[in-house]
Amino acid sequence: MFKVIPQDIQSRYSHQISPLLISKINNCELLYEPLSPAELHSYIVNYINILSSDLVKAGEGRISHWESGWKENLEEFKKSLNPESLIPKYHKKNNIARLNKQIIKSYSKDFDYHLHSFFVDALLLEHIPNYDKVFEFGCGTGYHLFRLNNYSPSKSFYGGDWSVASQNNISECSKAIGSHNIKGFNFNYFEPDYSIDIKDSLVYTVASLEQIGEKHDKVLEYFVNSKPGLCIHFEPIHEVLDPENLLDYLTIQYFNKRNYLKNYLTSLRKLESEGKIRILDTRRLYYGSKFIEGHTVIIWKPV
Protein backbone atom coordinates (compact mmCIF):
# COMPACT_ATOMS: atom_id res chain seq x y z
CA MET A 1 0.00 0.00 0.00
CA PHE A 2 1.27 3.48 -0.93
CA LYS A 3 0.29 7.01 0.03
CA VAL A 4 0.27 10.01 -2.31
CA ILE A 5 3.04 12.34 -1.14
CA PRO A 6 4.08 15.86 -2.22
CA GLN A 7 6.91 14.44 -4.33
CA ASP A 8 4.37 12.65 -6.56
CA ILE A 9 3.13 16.08 -7.64
CA GLN A 10 6.41 17.99 -7.32
CA SER A 11 8.21 15.54 -9.63
CA ARG A 12 6.01 16.61 -12.55
CA TYR A 13 6.71 20.35 -12.24
CA SER A 14 9.86 22.45 -12.54
CA HIS A 15 8.82 25.03 -9.91
CA GLN A 16 8.55 24.52 -6.15
CA ILE A 17 4.94 23.83 -5.24
CA SER A 18 3.19 25.89 -2.57
CA PRO A 19 3.96 25.08 1.09
CA LEU A 20 0.23 25.36 1.78
CA LEU A 21 -0.45 22.71 -0.84
CA ILE A 22 2.33 20.50 0.53
CA SER A 23 0.67 20.65 3.93
CA LYS A 24 -2.69 19.78 2.39
CA ILE A 25 -1.23 16.77 0.55
CA ASN A 26 0.48 15.53 3.71
CA ASN A 27 -2.77 15.80 5.66
CA CYS A 28 -4.80 13.96 3.03
CA GLU A 29 -4.56 10.18 3.34
CA LEU A 30 -4.70 9.12 -0.30
CA LEU A 31 -3.90 5.40 -0.28
CA TYR A 32 -3.44 3.23 -3.35
CA GLU A 33 -1.57 0.31 -4.88
CA PRO A 34 -0.67 -0.58 -8.47
CA LEU A 35 -2.79 -3.20 -10.19
CA SER A 36 -1.36 -6.70 -10.05
CA PRO A 37 -0.40 -8.32 -13.39
CA ALA A 38 -3.67 -10.27 -13.39
CA GLU A 39 -5.70 -7.15 -12.56
CA LEU A 40 -3.91 -5.16 -15.26
CA HIS A 41 -4.70 -7.89 -17.79
CA SER A 42 -8.39 -7.76 -16.84
CA TYR A 43 -8.31 -3.96 -17.00
CA ILE A 44 -6.92 -4.01 -20.56
CA VAL A 45 -9.44 -6.62 -21.73
CA ASN A 46 -12.26 -4.53 -20.26
CA TYR A 47 -10.83 -1.41 -21.90
CA ILE A 48 -10.81 -3.07 -25.32
CA ASN A 49 -14.40 -4.19 -24.80
CA ILE A 50 -15.40 -0.64 -23.84
CA LEU A 51 -13.84 0.68 -27.04
CA SER A 52 -15.93 -1.80 -29.00
CA SER A 53 -19.16 -0.47 -27.49
CA ASP A 54 -21.21 2.62 -28.29
CA LEU A 55 -19.79 5.48 -26.23
CA VAL A 56 -21.42 8.87 -25.80
CA LYS A 57 -19.73 11.47 -27.99
CA ALA A 58 -18.80 14.93 -26.75
CA GLY A 59 -20.02 17.97 -28.64
CA GLU A 60 -22.66 20.65 -29.03
CA GLY A 61 -25.56 18.27 -28.47
CA ARG A 62 -24.53 17.54 -24.88
CA ILE A 63 -25.58 20.81 -23.26
CA SER A 64 -28.75 19.34 -21.74
CA HIS A 65 -26.64 16.67 -20.06
CA TRP A 66 -24.43 19.29 -18.40
CA GLU A 67 -27.42 21.44 -17.41
CA SER A 68 -28.95 18.44 -15.67
CA GLY A 69 -25.72 17.42 -13.96
CA TRP A 70 -24.89 20.87 -12.60
CA LYS A 71 -28.50 21.32 -11.39
CA GLU A 72 -28.12 18.11 -9.41
CA ASN A 73 -24.99 19.49 -7.75
CA LEU A 74 -26.82 22.73 -6.97
CA GLU A 75 -29.67 20.90 -5.23
CA GLU A 76 -27.17 19.03 -3.09
CA PHE A 77 -25.39 22.28 -2.25
CA LYS A 78 -28.65 23.92 -1.16
CA LYS A 79 -29.18 21.09 1.31
CA SER A 80 -25.64 20.95 2.69
CA LEU A 81 -24.27 24.49 2.09
CA ASN A 82 -20.94 22.72 1.69
CA PRO A 83 -18.87 23.79 -1.37
CA GLU A 84 -17.61 20.20 -1.63
CA SER A 85 -21.08 19.23 -2.85
CA LEU A 86 -20.14 21.07 -6.06
CA ILE A 87 -17.58 18.37 -6.91
CA PRO A 88 -18.80 16.72 -10.15
CA LYS A 89 -20.07 13.17 -9.90
CA TYR A 90 -17.60 11.92 -12.51
CA HIS A 91 -14.87 12.20 -9.87
CA LYS A 92 -16.67 9.56 -7.82
CA LYS A 93 -17.35 6.88 -10.44
CA ASN A 94 -14.72 4.25 -9.59
CA ASN A 95 -11.53 3.49 -7.71
CA ILE A 96 -9.23 2.99 -10.70
CA ALA A 97 -6.88 5.83 -11.60
CA ARG A 98 -3.46 6.61 -13.09
CA LEU A 99 -0.37 7.86 -11.30
CA ASN A 100 3.34 7.81 -12.12
CA LYS A 101 2.73 5.94 -15.40
CA GLN A 102 0.86 3.16 -13.59
CA ILE A 103 -2.74 2.00 -13.41
CA ILE A 104 -3.67 1.98 -9.73
CA LYS A 105 -6.60 1.18 -7.46
CA SER A 106 -7.41 3.60 -4.67
CA TYR A 107 -8.58 2.97 -1.12
CA SER A 108 -9.50 6.51 -0.08
CA LYS A 109 -12.70 8.52 -0.41
CA ASP A 110 -12.69 11.01 -3.29
CA PHE A 111 -9.21 9.87 -4.34
CA ASP A 112 -9.71 10.91 -7.97
CA TYR A 113 -10.87 14.41 -7.03
CA HIS A 114 -8.13 15.08 -4.48
CA LEU A 115 -5.33 13.83 -6.73
CA HIS A 116 -6.73 15.90 -9.58
CA SER A 117 -6.98 19.04 -7.44
CA PHE A 118 -3.39 18.65 -6.21
CA PHE A 119 -2.02 18.66 -9.76
CA VAL A 120 -4.24 21.57 -10.85
CA ASP A 121 -3.54 23.69 -7.77
CA ALA A 122 0.20 23.02 -7.87
CA LEU A 123 0.45 24.89 -11.18
CA LEU A 124 -2.24 27.54 -10.79
CA LEU A 125 -1.01 28.66 -7.37
CA GLU A 126 2.34 29.40 -8.99
CA HIS A 127 0.74 31.87 -11.43
CA ILE A 128 -2.32 33.35 -9.69
CA PRO A 129 -0.25 35.81 -7.59
CA ASN A 130 0.85 37.52 -10.82
CA TYR A 131 -2.68 38.47 -11.93
CA ASP A 132 -5.57 40.47 -10.49
CA LYS A 133 -8.21 38.58 -12.48
CA VAL A 134 -8.45 34.82 -12.99
CA PHE A 135 -10.81 33.30 -15.58
CA GLU A 136 -11.78 29.65 -15.79
CA PHE A 137 -13.52 28.70 -19.04
CA GLY A 138 -15.77 25.65 -18.96
CA CYS A 139 -15.90 25.91 -15.17
CA GLY A 140 -18.91 23.64 -14.62
CA THR A 141 -20.09 23.93 -11.02
CA GLY A 142 -17.28 26.35 -10.20
CA TYR A 143 -15.63 23.92 -7.79
CA HIS A 144 -12.09 24.83 -8.87
CA LEU A 145 -12.83 28.54 -8.38
CA PHE A 146 -14.09 28.14 -4.82
CA ARG A 147 -11.17 25.93 -3.88
CA LEU A 148 -8.61 28.34 -5.35
CA ASN A 149 -10.31 31.24 -3.60
CA ASN A 150 -9.39 29.62 -0.29
CA TYR A 151 -5.73 30.19 -1.20
CA SER A 152 -6.10 33.62 -2.84
CA PRO A 153 -9.18 35.45 -1.49
CA SER A 154 -7.87 38.85 -2.62
CA LYS A 155 -8.12 37.93 -6.32
CA SER A 156 -11.15 38.29 -8.60
CA PHE A 157 -12.31 34.95 -9.99
CA TYR A 158 -14.60 34.49 -12.99
CA GLY A 159 -16.13 31.27 -14.24
CA GLY A 160 -17.54 30.90 -17.75
CA ASP A 161 -19.70 28.01 -18.93
CA TRP A 162 -22.36 27.42 -21.59
CA SER A 163 -24.68 25.96 -18.96
CA VAL A 164 -27.01 28.40 -17.17
CA ALA A 165 -26.97 25.99 -14.23
CA SER A 166 -23.26 26.78 -13.87
CA GLN A 167 -23.96 30.47 -13.26
CA ASN A 168 -26.69 29.53 -10.77
CA ASN A 169 -24.25 27.30 -8.90
CA ILE A 170 -21.67 30.07 -8.61
CA SER A 171 -24.25 32.67 -7.56
CA GLU A 172 -25.84 30.46 -4.88
CA CYS A 173 -22.54 29.26 -3.46
CA SER A 174 -21.07 32.77 -3.39
CA LYS A 175 -24.08 34.03 -1.43
CA ALA A 176 -23.94 31.13 1.01
CA ILE A 177 -20.27 31.57 1.87
CA GLY A 178 -20.35 35.37 1.73
CA SER A 179 -17.95 35.65 -1.19
CA HIS A 180 -18.07 38.74 -3.41
CA ASN A 181 -15.09 38.02 -5.65
CA ILE A 182 -16.33 34.96 -7.56
CA LYS A 183 -18.69 35.57 -10.47
CA GLY A 184 -20.12 33.42 -13.25
CA PHE A 185 -20.87 34.29 -16.86
CA ASN A 186 -22.36 32.45 -19.81
CA PHE A 187 -19.85 31.47 -22.46
CA ASN A 188 -20.17 29.10 -25.41
CA TYR A 189 -16.94 27.71 -26.88
CA PHE A 190 -18.71 27.29 -30.22
CA GLU A 191 -19.82 30.95 -30.34
CA PRO A 192 -17.39 33.00 -28.19
CA ASP A 193 -18.64 36.25 -26.68
CA TYR A 194 -16.02 38.94 -27.30
CA SER A 195 -17.61 41.21 -24.70
CA ILE A 196 -15.94 39.02 -22.07
CA ASP A 197 -12.76 41.01 -21.45
CA ILE A 198 -9.82 38.81 -20.45
CA LYS A 199 -7.02 41.19 -21.45
CA ASP A 200 -3.91 40.78 -19.25
CA SER A 201 -5.72 38.21 -17.08
CA LEU A 202 -4.88 34.61 -16.21
CA VAL A 203 -7.02 32.19 -18.22
CA TYR A 204 -7.23 28.46 -17.59
CA THR A 205 -9.26 25.42 -18.64
CA VAL A 206 -9.54 22.02 -16.98
CA ALA A 207 -10.90 19.19 -19.14
CA SER A 208 -13.49 21.46 -20.73
CA LEU A 209 -11.96 22.04 -24.16
CA GLU A 210 -12.07 18.25 -24.12
CA GLN A 211 -15.75 18.50 -25.02
CA ILE A 212 -15.39 20.37 -28.31
CA GLY A 213 -13.49 17.85 -30.43
CA GLU A 214 -11.99 19.47 -33.52
CA LYS A 215 -14.20 22.57 -33.29
CA HIS A 216 -11.73 24.70 -31.36
CA ASP A 217 -10.95 27.29 -34.05
CA LYS A 218 -13.39 29.95 -32.82
CA VAL A 219 -12.49 29.82 -29.15
CA LEU A 220 -8.77 29.70 -29.90
CA GLU A 221 -9.15 32.77 -32.11
CA TYR A 222 -11.00 34.47 -29.23
CA PHE A 223 -8.20 33.64 -26.79
CA VAL A 224 -5.51 34.93 -29.15
CA ASN A 225 -7.33 38.15 -30.08
CA SER A 226 -8.41 38.94 -26.51
CA LYS A 227 -4.79 39.11 -25.32
CA PRO A 228 -4.89 37.41 -21.91
CA GLY A 229 -1.69 37.60 -19.89
CA LEU A 230 -1.34 33.82 -19.81
CA CYS A 231 -3.32 30.73 -20.85
CA ILE A 232 -3.01 27.42 -19.01
CA HIS A 233 -4.74 24.26 -20.18
CA PHE A 234 -5.16 20.90 -18.45
CA GLU A 235 -6.65 18.96 -21.35
CA PRO A 236 -6.53 15.64 -23.25
CA ILE A 237 -3.76 16.21 -25.80
CA HIS A 238 -3.29 13.28 -28.15
CA GLU A 239 -0.20 14.80 -29.81
CA VAL A 240 1.99 14.10 -26.74
CA LEU A 241 0.97 10.44 -26.42
CA ASP A 242 2.97 7.54 -27.86
CA PRO A 243 0.88 5.29 -30.13
CA GLU A 244 3.55 2.58 -29.76
CA ASN A 245 2.79 2.38 -26.02
CA LEU A 246 -0.25 0.19 -25.27
CA LEU A 247 -1.86 2.40 -22.62
CA ASP A 248 -1.25 5.53 -24.70
CA TYR A 249 -2.65 3.79 -27.77
CA LEU A 250 -5.83 2.82 -25.91
CA THR A 251 -6.15 6.36 -24.58
CA ILE A 252 -5.90 7.79 -28.10
CA GLN A 253 -8.61 5.39 -29.27
CA TYR A 254 -10.80 6.47 -26.35
CA PHE A 255 -10.26 10.15 -27.22
CA ASN A 256 -11.36 9.42 -30.78
CA LYS A 257 -14.34 7.32 -29.73
CA ARG A 258 -15.63 10.05 -27.40
CA ASN A 259 -14.88 12.87 -29.88
CA TYR A 260 -12.58 14.58 -27.40
CA LEU A 261 -10.35 17.57 -28.17
CA LYS A 262 -8.30 16.97 -31.30
CA ASN A 263 -5.34 18.76 -32.91
CA TYR A 264 -5.39 21.63 -30.40
CA LEU A 265 -1.65 21.51 -29.75
CA THR A 266 -1.10 21.28 -33.51
CA SER A 267 -3.12 24.48 -33.94
CA LEU A 268 -1.13 26.21 -31.20
CA ARG A 269 2.15 25.20 -32.82
CA LYS A 270 0.96 26.61 -36.14
CA LEU A 271 0.07 29.92 -34.45
CA GLU A 272 3.51 29.97 -32.84
CA SER A 273 5.18 29.41 -36.21
CA GLU A 274 3.20 32.41 -37.50
CA GLY A 275 4.51 34.57 -34.65
CA LYS A 276 1.08 35.04 -33.05
CA ILE A 277 1.66 33.20 -29.77
CA ARG A 278 4.48 31.75 -27.69
CA ILE A 279 4.19 28.28 -26.16
CA LEU A 280 5.95 28.34 -22.80
CA ASP A 281 5.46 24.74 -21.71
CA THR A 282 3.93 21.44 -22.80
CA ARG A 283 4.04 18.86 -20.05
CA ARG A 284 2.66 15.39 -19.44
CA LEU A 285 1.69 14.89 -15.81
CA TYR A 286 1.35 11.11 -16.03
CA TYR A 287 -1.77 10.93 -13.91
CA GLY A 288 -5.38 10.50 -14.87
CA SER A 289 -8.66 8.66 -14.52
CA LYS A 290 -9.61 5.07 -15.26
CA PHE A 291 -9.63 5.34 -19.03
CA ILE A 292 -7.48 8.33 -19.96
CA GLU A 293 -4.54 10.51 -19.15
CA GLY A 294 -6.60 13.60 -19.79
CA HIS A 295 -4.75 16.54 -18.24
CA THR A 296 -1.64 17.36 -20.23
CA VAL A 297 -0.48 20.90 -19.41
CA ILE A 298 -0.03 23.55 -22.09
CA ILE A 299 1.03 27.08 -21.12
CA TRP A 300 1.06 29.79 -23.76
CA LYS A 301 0.54 33.51 -24.28
CA PRO A 302 -0.38 35.77 -27.20
CA VAL A 303 2.46 37.82 -28.67
Language-model features, listed with the residues they occupy:
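Conserved beta-strand signature within the Rossmann-like core of class I S-adenosyl-L-methionine
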Residues: 228-239
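Conserved Class I S-adenosyl-L-methionine
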Residues: 246-272
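Class I SAM-dependent methyltransferase SAM/SAH-binding core
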Residues: 143-191
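A short SAM/SAH-binding and catalytic strip from SAM-dependent methyltransferases
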Residues: 201-215
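N-terminal accessory regions of S-adenosyl-L-methionine
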Residues: 1-118, 248, 270, 274, ...
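Conserved glycine-rich SAM-binding loop
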Residues: 140
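Class I SAM-dependent methyltransferase core
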Residues: 136
